[in-house]
């Protein structure tokens, strides 16, 4: 197992169904000789040169710090250090991906939750010792870490099914969904393009905005509409009225209706 072999496995998994993609990536969590060799090499380089920077991307999000060994639209392979929370989390993140987690310095301790209908329910405790590989289907499962047990180091792989990835943030006390997001890089690129067209005043590109209004998630449709209104308010009024009347999401209908009421001219009192 080498980093080059990992890169080849990620490439091979790119167009595979979820089970096939997992079959390509799972061996690199079962045998982490490649990771240990990389750590040994980089430690030697830093001893020889205190200014040496490892040739991988580093990132931080919340309590997690990450070294990124592979990242594509579908597959991430990362080494992570998580600072434990002072108290148990009140919300759960269902990432929409399949997670493979190998603890490196201590056991993973926590509580497993699953989705039944639209609610999160407790499934029981989790104990994954060092050297084991914990697998979670984070489309329907989420782990709440036990607070206060010291930093946790893990090697992780996150593998998405083909197509857009839907993540959910669910309140533990009520079990209800608090937020939905679609990790859809195609839509993100589309929205960036629409923003550029708007900044350039490209009113001749209105058909691009019309086409993007059929995005699958409510927040995506509303984001497109805001760009459309900023580009050409007059041209956007008809699709805005359609959205206020017929959008599948009640909140989007309400936002569109409120916006339409502010934009439509007042009738002449004469």
Regions flagged by a language model, labelled:
Residues 1-76:
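A short, N-terminal "cap"/entry segment at the start of jelly-roll beta-barrel domains
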Residues 172-178, 202-213, 233-245, 267-270:
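Amphipathic alpha-helical scaffolding segments comprising HEAT/armadillo-like alpha-solenoid repeats
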